Curated annotation (Swiss-Prot):
Protein name per the record: Small integral membrane protein 8
Top-level lineage group: Eukaryota
A GO CC annotation given for this chain: membrane
Gene: SMIM8
Pfam families for this protein: DUF4500
InterPro entries registered for this protein in UniProt: UPF0708
Keyword Secreted among record annotations: no
Subcellular location: Membrane
Amino acid sequence: MSSAPEPPTFKKEPPKEKEFQSPGLRGVRTTTLFRAVNPELFIKPNKPVMAFGLVTLSLCVAYIGYLHAIQENKKDLYEAIDSEGHSYMRRKTSKWD
């Protein structure tokens, strides 16, 4: 007697060319000038180049840290010459110690 009514079937139509937009900023309508000034927003990321940049930046930071550590070690040393004329490196001492 009372059977459940069947839900209406919806037909999924494929998106038309004008309606389809790619995700992200690549699908946004922008001017050519904006795309020329900001190409990194519209170009697919290049993972090998990103990895190379990350390694290079890490090595630069490590080298700067190394130079800083070397400079800190040299700051407390000075060249001393004994009575016989031999020179050697000696650590600075404070008069207050």
